[in-house]
A protein has these predicted regions:
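Hydrophobic/small residue at the entry helix of a nucleotide-binding pocket
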Residues: 12
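NAD(P)-binding Rossmann-fold cofactor-contacting core
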Residues: 29-43
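Rossmann-fold cofactor-recognition segment
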Residues: 46-58
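Conserved Rossmann-fold cofactor-binding substructure of NAD(P)-dependent oxidoreductases
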Residues: 56-68
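ADP-ribose/adenylate-binding Rossmann-like module
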Residues: 77, 87-105
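Rossmann-fold NAD(P)-binding glycine/threonine-rich loop
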Residues: 99-121
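C-terminal catalytic/substrate-binding lobe primarily of soluble NAD(P)-dependent oxidoreductases
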Residues: 140-305
Length: 305
């Protein structure tokens, strides 16, 4: 029997855990789920799934739970991955995450090789499946084509007939904080052999309209650093390389207002905000407690009539 340790028991993890549980008999799997709160899996037991209460910051306990597994899957927030990767590289455990590869973790590459173990990051939807589909196309074209431009767009969107409609036409299906902070690091891509850099304030203003057959027109905005994939995709001589995020029409302009209001800023806080109404919180954070009606303040700030 192959043992898999999954770190984290949040929304995305639960989908993966159920999927592996359904395949556990076929592939002879035993899945350990370790997190601070695993109560869901005690009250909703799954086949071949063992929940373990674990404080990820307890490195000794974490290491003990890794010792008898073939694979570690970290579904934790990305800032926690380095400590997980460090332990795995020391004891020779295979590790998979869905998060972007950082320069810090990349330095552990040789340590994993020495222990005959692998580290696979960017194994989610975006980044992940988009890489696979990109390389599938590039490899299929092969050397018979001289690629001048390569653009890819990915977005976790509601199906057109979804009953979960809301004004944003969007639903959180993964870490909500990552959605809120999307674009905050800016973006860089290659356009006509020139590097284009966008700041946080610019990203949602510069969108591309993408038409998808039978689905309609969507918005695409620049996603982080596309330049670093020139070598990875073996597209060193290409003129344009752009990786984008896909959203429904109207999302970007509306989200840009939240950015300009400072509501996506996680670096500053408002004193006693838990006791405030949303109205008072907005006035306190954005408008320094001005007495005017909040709708009038926002309309005036952005010249909305």
């Amino acid at each position: 029997m192959k043992n898999i340790l999954i770190l984290g028991a949040g929304k995305s993890s639960t989908v993966l855990i159920k999927y592996l549980s359904n395949l556990s008999e076929k592939f002879n799997l035993k899945i350990k789920v370790a997190a601070l709160d695993v109560s869901y899996f005690f009250s909703n037991p799954l086949n071949n799934v063992l929940p373990i209460e674990l404080d990820i910051n307890n490195l000794d306990q974490l290491k003990r739970n890794m010792m008898n597994v073939s694979l570690v899957v970290s579904m934790l927030p990305n800032f926690m991955h380095f400590k997980i990767a460090k332990i795995c590289s020391n004891i020779g455990k295979n590790l998979i995450t869905a998060s972007y590869l950082t320069s810090e973790i990349k330095k552990l590459h040789n340590d994993f090789l020495k222990k005959n173990a692998f580290l696979l990051m960017e194994m989610g939807l975006d980044p992940g499946i988009d890489h696979m589909s990109a390389m599938k196309i590039i490899h299929k074209l092969g050397r018979d084509y001289n690629l001048k431009s390569f653009e890819s767009y990915t977005g976790g969107l509601l199906t057109p007939n979804s009953k979960s409609y809301n004004p944003w036409n969007y639903k959180f299906t993964w870490n909500s904080k990552n959605v809120i902070l999307a674009g905050s690091q800016g973006a860089i891509y290659l356009e006509n052999k020139k590097k284009v850099k966008l700041s946080y304030d610019e990203i949602f203003n510069k969108i591309n309209l993408i038409e998808i057959p039978q689905l309609g027109v969507f918005e695409g905005y620049a996603n982080r650093d596309s330049i670093k994939y020139l070598d990875i995709y073996n597209l060193k001589n290409i003129d344009t390389l752009f990786r984008g995020t896909l959203r429904n029409r109207g999302f970007s302009s509306a989200w840009n207002l939240l950015v300009k209001l400072g509501l996506t800023d996680d670096k500053t806080s408002v004193n006693k905000s838990l006791n405030m109404t949303y109205n008072n919180f907005l006035k306190s954070k954005v408008f320094k407690n001005k007495k005017e009606d909040i709708q009038k303040l926002i309309s005036s700030k952005f010249n909305i009539k």
